[in-house]
Amino acid sequence: MIKHNLVSDLRRLFIDFFVKNGHQFFPSSPLIIKDDPSLLFTNAGMVQFKQIFTSVDGRSINTAVSSQKCLRVGGKHNDLENVGHTNRHHTFFEMLGNFSFGSYFKEHAIELAWNFVIKELALDRKRLYITVYHDDQDAFNLWKKISSFSDDKIIKIKTNDNFWSMGNVGPCGPCSEIFYDYGESVKGGLPGTPEEDGARFTEIWNLVFMEYNRTKEGELSVLPRKCIDTGMGLERIAAVMQGVHDNYDINLFKALIAMSKKESGNSSCEIAHRVIADHVRSAAFLIAEGLTPGNEGRDYILRRIIRRAARYVYMLKYTDSLMYKIFPVLIDETSNAYMADYYPELLKAKDMIISILKTEEENFKDTLVRALPLLEKELTYLSAGDVLSGDVIFRLYDTYGFPVDITLDIIKERGIRFDEKGFYDNMEQQKTRSRLSHLIKSTEQLNGKIWEDIRQNYNNTRFVGYDNFQVQSKILSMVMNNDRNVTVANVGDKVSILMDVTPFYAEAGGQQADTGLLSVVRRDGKDLFGSSNIADVTNTKNIFDGLYIHECIIKSGSLIIGDIVSAEINSHRRKDLCANHSATHLLHYILRMEIDNNIMQKGSLVGNDKLRFDFSYNMALTEKQIKLIENRMCDLIRQNHPVETNICNLQDAMDNGAIALFTEKYDNHEVRVVNIGNSKELCCGTHVKYTGEIGCFKIISESSIACGIRRIEAVTGQYAIDYFRQQEKVLYQVAESVKSPVEDVLVQIDKINRENQELKQKLWAAYFDIIDMQGVNIEKIGNINFLHGTLSGVPIDVVRKFIMKRLVKDMIMLFSNVVNHNRIYVVGVGNSLHSKVKAADFVKIINCVVKSKGGGNAQLAQISTEYIAEVNVIQHIKDELVSIFNA
């Protein structure tokens, strides 16, 4: 029986109970699913066992128990809009579950569930009710036998709520649920009644009896291996055990909400605090898995969660960032909301979580300040039941960047309806306007209208550049200077050319485009040998998803529509691009294998001279880690792995472990998979045939480009060799300048640094003597000593150091000096005086006499003014000090 009812206690009790009953424990799988494009996030306990249920995963696992972190913020299961407005909805929650893969079925599953709720949780059986699917007489009889319940306590449900399926086809089966009765003081009716949506009867456990297979014709057949899938919401059962019927009243949420109220200084608006508490938890777990706020896919979901919470922070009239101040409750061992014991990733990623929450909330606050007053103004004219114009919603979105979902949140709270048609009409018009704009942007000012007309007359270009560096092709169309169609292009002309077939790779997937030559080989049906009609291809672009545009400069002769040309790419440049692209895949693989499996690609650039790879990670790579990456890369290069590509549908690719950066854009189309050893990625780029062709690899920089995002730049092949030679050249130049053999350079530099430091100390001492000789005035004001003086020829950094060296706790020091036609004041204030005056306060004090600027802290400040004459500054300061210390 449970002795404590904290969330962590309940989680441990559940897991221990099923482990004692022969189940294998599985830690929670990530929220971000690596091998299932059908789901944005893990949303149920069974997700990590999906391949076992369907027998795709051949591991011999008979039973399992887990506490699975889940997120429901999109698609069929989207609880985002309900969070804060109901007692039970969360974006992030934990699902306790026990599973059987052919080991046991209904009777033992029911037996285990009953024993847990009655013997371990010690729930009052009088408060429990059971539901079964109306056709599942077997489950009805088993519950009656095991629980000794009367027929009226076991309710048959006819709706599909009690029949679960994995999809339209595949494994499925009836469900049975355990409900808890909170009593007559809470509104609501039994399951299956019109009042069932009330809070009185709460489902605490769902048992799925997976015994059928549904065909595409809808027919059911008995599965040869029957399975059990159960789910118990940890937050819900915690509410039951803690005697509350509101999940937000459990210890975990109470701790988060208490911190929200404390930090914001606002205890009103309970809904706001609930939303903030829920969303902080969700965002923290997503960031811990490597997500950063963005504008697409999962990154956008994270941004949406943080921004929704930020809007509620704004409602509290709290002007600072709040979420990052609440998060530490989740990693504080003394807190009732402590989760880092079971989820250590929260502790590991704490700095990144705090930084991202703070930055994203700060950035969005500007949007809130600009857009919300405009929305509020529009809403003053509307009442519940009215419709907010789609034009207004679109203007807020398009002009101010105010998210539509937040607008809908706000109007929903007030009972105002959404002008869906008006909004989407505006969106469609904007898409039409931006289509050409996007085309122009993507083609660097190509005339969109001209190419739209051309597209009507020609099929997509046939790309053959994976296997061919040179092909013969026919010129179909030419556009001169981006504004007119031409039939002939002459020497010096800049022209964009469309051909029927091309070996030129157009920029895509981060890889730069091919360059090369076009040479006319046939004109008007006649072969031209040794043709002098040549064009340089300087860039290649793919527009309209299949029309390849070659940007050219006519080098000699002319090109005419209808010419047959030899289209030849710059093979040396292509090979460098291939080496860098394959190295990028291997770098991604190594980072995940050797540094952190949660690392995700955030962007890349594959050039011929270097590669750039952006990835999610919350700290700088150490020198040791960089060496590990380089060594592992060199191993893979030396092993000379073949690089293989194959075409398959997306699901097959994902089932085989391929990484897709943005699975949503692929839908169910065929995809190209690039396999390099154990690295598998969806990719349309060009690659080496064997890893040995990469030659060598060197990381030349590693840096931060945004909160939680790092960037690696590296070189391969000849460029890596050139880099080594340049570094070697610099080393020899340094050795020559310090007059040392190369092998002793560090020793010699260390010696020079020591000598330099000794000379610097002597110089400082000399300057200190100069200050003493130039005279220091000492005056007693109250109980303090005020030292001041006017200096010349002493650097300001020396003055600061002098003050910090001589300053004592009951002393104020002020020196001035003229530097570059400005008088500089440096002020020091002893520690014991900070309660009455700080060094930074002297910025205002001096500014009362002469116009000045500056800054500092409690102990030291620096102020600058264009007025070289000291005027009455010292006297004014003394007067101020008298009023401060004699008051």
Curated annotation (Swiss-Prot):
Pfam families: tRNA-synt_2c, tRNA_SAD. One of its GO terms (molecular function) is zinc ion binding. Signal peptide: none annotated. It catalyses: tRNA(Ala) + L-alanine + ATP = L-alanyl-tRNA(Ala) + AMP + diphosphate. Its EC number is 6.1.1.7. It comes from the Bacteria. SUPFAM superfamilies: Class II aaRS and biotin synthetases (SSF55681), Putative anticodon-binding domain of alanyl-tRNA synthetase (AlaRS) (SSF101353), ThrRS/AlaRS common domain (SSF55186), Translation proteins (SSF50447). Its cofactor is Zn(2+). GO terms for cellular component: cytosol. It is an enzyme of class 6 (ligase). Keywords: Aminoacyl-tRNA synthetase, ATP-binding, Cytoplasm, Ligase, Metal-binding, Nucleotide-binding, Protein biosynthesis, RNA-binding, tRNA-binding, Zinc. Binds 1 zinc ion per subunit. Catalyzes the attachment of alanine to tRNA(Ala) in a two-step reaction: alanine is first activated by ATP to form Ala-AMP and then transferred to the acceptor end of tRNA(Ala). Also edits incorrectly charged Ser-tRNA(Ala) and Gly-tRNA(Ala) via its editing domain. Consists of three domains; the N-terminal catalytic domain, the editing domain and the C-terminal C-Ala domain. The editing domain removes incorrectly charged amino acids, while the C-Ala domain, along with tRNA(Ala), serves as a bridge to cooperatively bring together the editing and aminoacylation centers thus stimulating deacylation of misacylated tRNAs. Belongs to the class-II aminoacyl-tRNA synthetase family. This is Alanine--tRNA ligase. It comes from Ehrlichia ruminantium (strain Gardel).
